[in-house]
């Protein structure tokens, strides 16, 4: 074989070898499986999200706790009675200033209180009533500590209006709002009110002084 032919054959074999090597490399690259990092990334992302969530929840918890503390403190402080309220918890009344047969209205804890200096005739009238006929049966003696002094809350037991004294069909009090009539003992006798006028806590500190509350 001539040297020219030999070189040509050698070059051809070299080219084929190069082509085969390139083909093998290409096949190897095409079969290469890239590692899957998704789970790792997802885990990191999930952990980051959880950490952020924990941070936000913790922050909101602290803010909520602080807000709740302020609310509770404000709520409790609203129950702290002021000096004015404490001063009105009890009211002293000088009875010598109230003539017999007359009413006086005082204010106690924001409510009207009726004080009636009853006459002997009024006391007798109150005691002559048959309590079996009353809607809210009460003896007059159970409503007073001293027969001549009747002390009641001036609030109609129907819807809370203030009755008028020395009025009505029974010589006691009349509520103009819905027509309830109370007798000289403050007992309901006619109209929609279900109960007698309420008796507040009171005491006589001496013969001339009444303490309401």
Swiss-Prot record:
Membrane topology term: Single-pass membrane protein
Broad class of enzyme this protein falls into: translocase
Chain segment of the transit peptide: 1-29
Binding of [2Fe-2S] cluster, residues: 156, 158, 175, 178
CDD domains per the UniProt record, alphabetical: Rieske_cytochrome_bc1
Residue span(s) of domain Rieske: 116-211
Cofactor, how bound (note): Binds 1 [2Fe-2S] cluster per subunit.
BP GO annotations: mitochondrial electron transport, ubiquinol to cytochrome c
Transmembrane segments: 48-77
UniProt GO MF annotations: 2 iron, 2 sulfur cluster binding; metal ion binding; oxidoreductase activity; ubiquinol-cytochrome-c reductase activity
Top-level taxon of the source organism: Eukaryota
Keyword Transport: yes
E.C. numbers: 7.1.1.8
Keyword annotations of the record: 2Fe-2S, Disulfide bond, Electron transport, Iron, Iron-sulfur, Membrane, Metal-binding, Mitochondrion, Mitochondrion inner membrane, Respiratory chain, Transit peptide, Translocase, Transmembrane, Transmembrane helix, Transport
Principal localisation: mitochondrion
Stated induction or repression of this protein's expression: Expression is induced in high iron conditions. Expression is repressed in alkaline conditions, by niric oxide and during spider biofilm formation. Expression is also repressed by HAP43.
Cofactor: [2Fe-2S] cluster
UniProt note: phenotype after gene disruption: Leads to hypersensitivity to azole treatment and sharply curtails fungal growth in the presence of macrophages. Leads to decreased vegetative growth on several carbon sources including maltose, citrate and acetate.
Residues exposed to the Mitochondrial intermembrane side: 78-213
A cellular component term, taken from the record's GO annotations: mitochondrial inner membrane
Function: Component of the ubiquinol-cytochrome c oxidoreductase, a multisubunit transmembrane complex that is part of the mitochondrial electron transport chain which drives oxidative phosphorylation. The complex plays an important role in the uptake of multiple carbon sources present in different host niches.
Family: Belongs to the Rieske iron-sulfur protein family.
NCBIfam families (UniProt xref): Rieske_proteo (TIGR01416)
Annotated protein name in UniProt: Cytochrome b-c1 complex subunit Rieske, mitochondrial
Organism listed in the record: Candida albicans (strain SC5314 / ATCC MYA-2876) (Yeast)
């Amino acid at each position: 074989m001539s040297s020219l032919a030999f070189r040509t054959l050698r070059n051809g074999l070299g080219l084929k070898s190069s082509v085969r090597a390139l083909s093998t490399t290409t096949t190897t690259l095409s079969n290469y499986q890239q590692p899957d990092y998704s789970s790792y990334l997802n885990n990191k992302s999930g952990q980051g999200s959880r950490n952020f969530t924990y941070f936000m929840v913790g922050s909101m918890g602290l803010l909520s706790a602080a807000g709740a503390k302020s609310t509770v403190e404000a709520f409790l402080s609203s129950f702290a009675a002021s000096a004015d309220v404490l001063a009105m918890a009890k009211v002293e009344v000088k009875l010598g200033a109230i003539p017999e047969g007359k009413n006086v209205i005082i204010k106690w804890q924001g409510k009207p209180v009726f004080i009636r200096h009853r006459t002997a005739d009024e006391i007798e009238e109150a005691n002559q009533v048959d309590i079996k006929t009353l809607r809210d049966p009460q003896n007059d003696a159970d409503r007073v500590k001293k027969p001549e002094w009747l002390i009641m809350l001036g609030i109609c037991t129907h819807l809370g209006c203030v009755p008028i004294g020395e009025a009505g069909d029974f010589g006691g009090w009349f509520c103009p709002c819905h027509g309830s009539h109370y007798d000289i003992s403050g007992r309901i006798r006619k109209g929609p009110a279900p109960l007698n006028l309420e008796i507040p806590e009171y005491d006589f500190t001496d013969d001339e002084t009444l303490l309401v509350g």
